[in-house]
UniProtKB/Swiss-Prot annotation:
One of its GO terms (cellular component) is plastid. This is Uncharacterized protein ycf72. It comes from the Eukaryota. Belongs to the ycf72 family. The keyword Repressor does not apply. It comes from Oryza sativa subsp. indica. Keywords: Chloroplast, Plastid. It is found in: Plastid, Chloroplast. The gene is ycf72-1.
């Protein structure tokens, strides 16, 4: 008599009252009955940063069928430098020390070969590195 639950009150449905699915299982099966035995939890978080992939062109199609293509450098580029292995000091308040954003001035259909040979963002990383070095000294 003790193995079965008591009957429900008058007027209640009996469809949800049943014996638990964990009855008769081993103690190790009570903790993870739905997971396969080959499943291993990762003990630590990943230590390498995730880098977003940037496409070299942006293609948009309007409802009437017109195709617009914006090539490099006519769209905004965001990039991050690799973080240091050990941080000596935290960044300044309200300053993100590793993220830079370069926004173009206009749309250029042709890509100049001199643009690809030069660093298009010369002051971005050196500015943040000078801030960090001046604070850590």
């Amino acid at each position: 008599m003790g193995a079965f639950p008591s009957p429900p009150p008058w007027g209640w449905s009996t469809g949800f009252i049943t014996t638990p699915l964990t009855t008769g299982r081993l103690p190790s099966q009570h903790l993870d009955p739905a997971l396969p035995k080959l499943f291993w939890f990762t003990p630590t978080l990943p230590t390498c940063p995730t880098v977003a992939k940037q496409f070299w062109d942006t293609k948009r199609t309007s409802p009437d069928g017109n195709l617009k293509v914006a090539d490099l450098p006519s769209f905004a580029i965001s990039f991050a430098t690799a973080p240091a292995a050990l941080a000596n000091c935290p960044p300044l308040p309200r300053v993100i020390s590793m993220l830079c954003m370069a926004v173009p001035k206009g749309i250029s259909v042709e890509v100049d070969s001199s643009f690809l040979s030069k660093n298009p963002f010369p002051n971005c990383t050196s500015f943040f590195q000078s801030i960090r070095l001046s604070r850590c000294i």
